[in-house]
């Protein structure tokens, strides 16, 4: 009876130590994630459910800035073209961590004039991949992250 109890205590201590070590790295990971997205362009493609092979579309997002606010909350400011105007639109978003991998979570976010969006997007290295929903339409998205060239 004592032997299993000792094993459980040892495993608990190891798990607590690993969790503490991971928590210690979180601020550096968050800073690196903010730096990667600030001034970046995400270039890739997206698909529509049921039409993956037929309707793969080119996709591009320009990120002006990425800032952590409090807890899991971030503000991602993206350039968006609405009609003839190009605007910097701040989007309140949650970022959760799966080990060293950030995952953006956006649920039922309404952008006036564009509609309501839900997305889950994972970032690793210079790649991103995820799912999206806009009203009745939804699908997958994926691509590469690179720095936005400066305008001359």
Please place each PLM-identified region on the residue numbering.
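Positively charged n-region of N-terminal signal peptides that target proteins for export
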Residues: 1-4
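Bacterial N-terminal signal peptides
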Residues: 7-16
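Boundary at the C-terminal end of the N-terminal hydrophobic targeting segment
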Residues: 18-20
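Short linear interaction motifs
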Residues: 22-24
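Central antiparallel beta-sheet cores of small beta-barrel/beta-sandwich binding domains
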Residues: 26-30, 36, 40-152
